[in-house]
Amino acid sequence: MDLSLLKALSEADAIASSEQEVRQILLEEADRLQKEVRFDGLGSVLIRLNESTGPKVMICAHMDEVGFMVRSISREGAIDVLPVGNVRMAARQLQPVRITTREECKIPGLLDGDRQGNDVSAMRVDIGARSYDEVMQAGIRPGDRVTFDTTFQVLPHQRVMGKAFDDRLGCYLLVTLLRELHDAELPAEVWLVASSSEEVGLRGGQTATRAVSPDVAIVLDTACWAKNFDYGAANHRQIGNGPMLVLSDKSLIAPPKLTAWVETVAAEIGVPLQADMFSNGGTDGGAVHLTGTGVPTVVMGPATRHGHCAASIADCRDILQMQQLLSALIQRLTRETVVQLTDFR
């Protein structure tokens, strides 16, 4: 497993609409392998893996992470921020963060906020400034992006910890597929899509799908269980138990034919799956499957512990198994298979 790539993706700072640091990593890989690259109007990256007269398949992961944006600067030097995406309440107080200025300078600070019951409001970043002028002299302006200041770490037992695993694990899988299959003979035309602005409303998933117009889509994302050390039967997001196969969420109910086919292929190659349902939230799949006249879509990905906060934990074996499964699915997506998956008669 390429831990240096995962580290680079995790430590890149990219809230919605400001995903250039992640985009650059993907573009360097695509350029190195001389792949065609397109963009949608929001900045999503569309990499054409191969040419084929077969069906068109889209593999999608989002680039953005939850974070904050500078809203205003007080006379005393407090930097008021607003959340971008659904940042956990517990992660809105006393957290190291970094501000990325328009000049791409990184300025560390401490995030804090006012707690009222279970809510945290009036969030601000302290960079040690004593006045408005000192903040301005540091180059900070309203609109600058703020992300958690988290260093990627390798943990015991093939596990890793870092920020923005939602959805840099998906972006990592896009790159590994690009590397593995860049010169393979495939039965389908495959587009690897890194979408913009998922955390603020599944935006790039919609616009990128319009640009690709796929016959089938696989969306990569992550999720965690509310109680990280609950290993009971209801928890289908346990790290180390294999990738998640999301049967339904608030925005998408996956076609049973498609999920059954994924389960069959996974069993053939010996990859365990955790069949899961999200009672809250959704993924790019919600936007993807409603594009055009409808796109058969399934959501999969590695489970994590903790999410939408300063750091998550994942198991490298889950990531590798997800890569194995994606490769196997892509190599089996013949025109006949797609016809069978989309036949409603």
UniProtKB/Swiss-Prot annotation:
Keywords: Aminopeptidase, Cobalt, Hydrolase, Metal-binding, Metalloprotease, Protease
Transmembrane segments: none
Enzyme Commission number(s): 3.4.11.-
CC cofactor note: Binds 2 divalent metal cations per subunit. Can use cobalt, and to a lesser extent, nickel, manganese or copper.
Record-level GO BP terms: proteolysis
Residues annotated for a divalent metal cation 1 binding in this entry: 62, 166, 221
Binding site residues for a divalent metal cation 2: 166, 199, 308
Active site (record annotation): 198 (proton acceptor)
Cofactor: Co(2+); Ni(2+); Mn(2+); Cu(2+)
UniProt GO molecular function: aminopeptidase activity; metal ion binding; metalloaminopeptidase activity; metallopeptidase activity
Disulphide bond pairs: none
InterPro entries xref list: Peptidase_M42 (IPR008007), Peptidase_M42_aminopept (IPR051464), Peptidase_M42_dom2 (IPR023367)
Pfam families: Peptidase_M42 (PF05343)
NCBIfam families to which the protein is assigned, alphabetical: PRK09961.1 (NF007421)
Family membership noted in the UniProt record: Belongs to the peptidase M42 family.
Primary role: Has a broad aminopeptidase activity on non-blocked peptides by progressively cleaving amino acids off the peptide substrate. Aminopeptidase activity stops at the residue before the first proline in the peptide. Cannot cleave when proline is the first N-terminal residue.
Name this protein carries in UniProt: Aminopeptidase YpdE
